[in-house]
């Protein structure tokens, strides 16, 4: 079974590019990373930084998560991210996404030993 940490990497890490390559980025990535298998995942964020830099956020600024849990951390520095948001015309299995690039602080939830990101909470 896929671990929570591995799922985070699959759904949110794209260290191989510094930003979204094209307006088609989300359509390609959401499909290739298995987020359109059973349904269209409505919203997802990819982070274009090294895994080490994203894992380091787990020891950065302690903040509350959206759901009120306290295991979230905000990055001290901004990171290159791409937001993928389902378009109005998107219909499973033909999932369609709008690609938006940004430089923002990320907020992740961390757990385990080693203490690593398991959930992408928000970007600010």
From Swiss-Prot:
Pfam families xref list: RnaseA (PF00074)
Gene Ontology molecular functions: lyase activity; nucleic acid binding; ribonuclease A activity
Biased composition (Basic and acidic residues): 1-13
Entry binding sites for substrate: 7, 10, 41-45, 66, 85
EC number assigned by the record: 4.6.1.18
Keywords for the protein's UniProt record, in alphabetical order: Disulfide bond, Endonuclease, Hydrolase, Lyase, Nuclease, Secreted
Disulfide bond annotation, renumbered to this chain: 26-84, 40-95, 58-110, 65-72
Region (Disordered): 1-25
Subcellular location per the Swiss-Prot or TrEMBL entry: Secreted
Major site of localization recorded for this protein: secreted
Active site: 12, 119
Catalytic activity: an [RNA] containing cytidine + H2O = an [RNA]-3'-cytidine-3'-phosphate + a 5'-hydroxy-ribonucleotide-3'-[RNA]; an [RNA] containing uridine + H2O = an [RNA]-3'-uridine-3'-phosphate + a 5'-hydroxy-ribonucleotide-3'-[RNA]
Biological processes, Gene Ontology terms: defense response to Gram-positive bacterium
Entry-linked SMART domains: RNAse_Pc
Keyword Disulfide bond attached: yes
InterPro entries per record: RNaseA, RNaseA-like_dom_sf, RNaseA_AS, RNaseA_domain
A GO CC term attached to the entry: extracellular region
Quaternary structure, from the entry: Monomer. Interacts with and forms tight 1:1 complexes with RNH1. Dimerization of two such complexes may occur. Interaction with RNH1 inhibits this protein.
Designated name of the protein: Ribonuclease pancreatic
Lineage start: Eukaryota, Metazoa, Chordata, Craniata, Vertebrata
């Amino acid at each position: 079974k896929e671990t929570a940490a591995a799922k985070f990497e699959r759904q949110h890490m794209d260290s191989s590019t510094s930003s979204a390559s094209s307006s088609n980025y989300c359509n390609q990535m959401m499909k290739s990373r298995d987020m359109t298998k059973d349904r269209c995942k409505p919203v997802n964020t990819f982070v274009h930084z090294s895994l080490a830099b994203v894992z380091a956020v787990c020891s950065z600024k302690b903040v509350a998560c959206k759901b009120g849990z306290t295991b979230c951390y905000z990055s001290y520095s901004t990171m290159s991210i791409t937001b993928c948001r389902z378009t109005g015309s998107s219909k499973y299995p033909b999932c369609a996404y709008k690609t938006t690039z940004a430089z923002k602080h990320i907020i992740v939830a961390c757990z385990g030993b080693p203490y690593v990101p398991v959930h992408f909470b928000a970007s600010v």
